Design a protein with these regions (language model features):
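Well-ordered alpha-helical segments embedded in enzymatic catalytic cores
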Residues: 3-6, 119
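Glycine-rich phosphate-binding loop signature in dinucleotide/nucleotide-binding domains
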Residues: 11-16
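Conserved core of the sugar-phosphate nucleotidyltransferase
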Residues: 30-97, 107
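Active-site acidic Asp-centered loop
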Residues: 22-24
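Short aromatic/hydrophobic "clamp" motif used to bind/position activated sugar donors
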Residues: 19
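Feature captures the FAD/FMN-dependent oxidoreductase FAD-binding
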Residues: 27
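Left-handed beta-helix
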Residues: 98, 105-198
């Protein structure tokens, strides 16, 4: 929340009606326009993009959600000791810009600084908060293990092709850097070098 508060002047000077908030530790491909269409159709105050975590991820590392039949979030618990569901927040949210400004200002006045706990969880029974289920690959790389596992996932041709050979395309940033160097005696296995730029 503090990072958002530091950008209040930017939010206030913007004219877009909606804001997409996206965590920087997720690996995924998403068309935010589809999430926005869902958000508008539901007349939601907040939309939380969700994922169903696999066996390799512990849901208690994330915000765990319960959702009703209409997609509305009925319960939201941040990093529970025992997760009762595998539906988690991906850290991607859509909200009306003016509402976000009001909630940030109110939270800061009350010395509340956690976006999830002090806004989403606090207002879950007051605001219309909906879940938009992600139906494609998502991985959170906030730990060394998850970072490693995500890199190992990219050895899978289907995952590589999904990210680098299917629309929408992803291009790496072009930098003029020297190539990786492998010395005599190096032992490299299970490797996939990907450099796609345009």
């Amino acid at each position: 929340l503090d990072a958002m508060a530091q950008n209040l002047s930017f939010l206030k000077n913007s004219h877009e009606p909606y804001v997409v908030i996206a965590s920087g530790d997720g690996v995924y491909k998403m068309d935010y326009n589809k999430v926005l269409e869902f958000h508008i159709a539901k007349k939601a105050d907040f939309t939380v993009v969700t994922a169903d975590v696999t066996d390799k991820d512990d849901p208690s590392r994330f915000g765990v959600l319960r959702v009703d039949g209409d997609g509305r979030i009925t319960d939201f618990e941040e990093k529970p000791i025992n997760a009762e569901t595998s539906t988690v927040s991906t850290g991607v949210y859509i909200v009306r810009r003016r509402m976000l400004i009001e909630l940030i200002e109110k939270s800061m006045q009350e010395e509340r600084y956690d976006f999830v706990k002090d806004i989403l969880i606090r207002y879950k029974n007051v605001k219309k908060i909906y879940a938009y289920p992600m139906d494609s690959y998502w991985s959170n790389i906030s730990s060394v293990d998850s970072y490693y596992n995500t890199n190992m996932d990219f050895l899978n041709k289907d995952i590589r092709d999904y990210f680098f050979r299917q629309y929408p395309d992803i291009y790496s940033k072009v930098e003029d850097l020297p190539p990786a160097k492998y010395n005599v005696g190096s032992n490299v296995k299970n490797l996939s070098l990907i450099h796609i730029s345009e």
